[in-house]
A protein has these predicted regions:
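Alpha/beta-hydrolase-fold enzymes
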Residues: 84-167
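Conserved alpha/beta-hydrolase "acid-adjacent" motif
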Residues: 212-218
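Catalytic nucleophile-loop/oxyanion-hole region of alpha/beta-hydrolase
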Residues: 8-12, 35-70, 74, 244-249
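Catalytic active-site module of serine/aspartate enzymes centered on a nucleophile-bearing elbow/loop
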Residues: 233-271
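Gly/Ala-rich beta-loop-alpha elbow adjacent to hydrolase catalytic centers
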Residues: 77-81, 85
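The serine-hydrolase catalytic nucleophile loop
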Residues: 6-18, 32, 217
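Short beta-strand/loop motif that positions the catalytic acidic residue
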Residues: 199, 205-207
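Conserved alpha/beta-hydrolase
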Residues: 19-40
């Protein structure tokens, strides 16, 4: 299990993990390189390929734990990581189930989706910051940073009304509200939805129907390609996190899905 864009494992994920552990599943919850409790330099820099490698490393680490059946691994990801898990599970025969929560699965669709809730000026400022960040990183200098979440009208990766307050409500002690700006350029080039058709394991996709951050239509298309079980929630992107109206339902649906497909898994937890 891992978080989305700029997230850390102590920021709203532990309640999901503890629910899975209580249901008899073994849980390995991790931070990406350069974030939270994980090592790596530079800090707060998102590499989509690097995060995918981190998922693959976590799968190997989980498979090596005592008592774990290495042929029955599960992937869980939320937001940006909801796309990572599709890519990580594709073309593997050791994955027993996948849970993709409010997933970001199509960068171009997300960019078009953003035009409905952001002014052209806001989008231009974020893109300009990303371009400057890319140029600076290629020169070998320290990354250009931007907030993960900010208020509407400010520069940030997520600037929708309420996004700052929503993220702060789940933020753990290791979370930092900054991220390397060049990720804004990388996001638009990725389409993990294409990997959904190559996921052979049972797949649960949990969609927030009024999601202003991750396009729900793109998530639904990916779910169809992956022959997924789909759960819809009449809410926005952050409303499936702990303390929000639809968290309990999303958590319980995921638990039921995993128990149904992993009924023989034994109990331990490392959250």
């Amino acid at each position: 299990m891992a978080h989305g864009l700029g997230g850390t494992k102590d920021s709203g994920l532990e309640p999901f993990a503890r629910a899975f552990a209580a249901a008899g599943l073994e849980v390995l919850l991790f931070d990406y390189r350069g974030f939270g409790g994980s090592g790596g330099e530079p800090r707060q820099v998102v590499s989509l390929d690097g995060q995918l490698e981190d998922y693959e490393a976590a799968l190997q680490a989980a498979a090596d734990l005592p008592g774990v059946d290495p042929s029955r691994l599960v992937l869980w990801g939320i937001s940006l990581a909801g796309g990572h898990v599709l890519r990580a599970a594709a073309d593997r025969d050791d994955i027993a189930a996948v849970v993709s929560v409010v997933p970001m699965v199509d960068g171009l669709a997300a960019a078009l989706h953003a035009t409905a809730s952001h002014t052209p000026g806001e989008l231009l400022r974020s893109t300009a910051r990303g371009i400057r960040g890319r140029l600076v990183s290629r020169s070998g200098r320290a990354p250009v940073m931007m907030p993960v979440v900010a208020r509407p009208g400010e520069v940030g990766a997520l600037t929708l009304p309420g996004a700052l307050e929503d993220y702060l409500s789940i933020a753990g002690p290791t979370w930092r509200n900054e991220i390397a700006a060049e990720v804004t350029l990388e996001l638009g080039t990725r389409k993990p939805a294409a990997a959904a058709a190559r996921v052979d394991a049972p797949l649960l996709v949990q969609i927030a129907d009024f999601d202003q951050s991750a396009p729900p239509q793109a998530a639904a298309k990916a779910a169809f390609k992956g022959r997924a079980e789909v759960r819809h929630y009449p809410c926005d992107h952050f409303d499936l996190f702990p303390g929000k109206p639809w968290h309990d339902a999303a958590r319980d649906h995921a638990v039921a899905f995993l128990v149904r497909h992993l009924a023989s898994t034994k109990v331990t937890a490392d959250a």
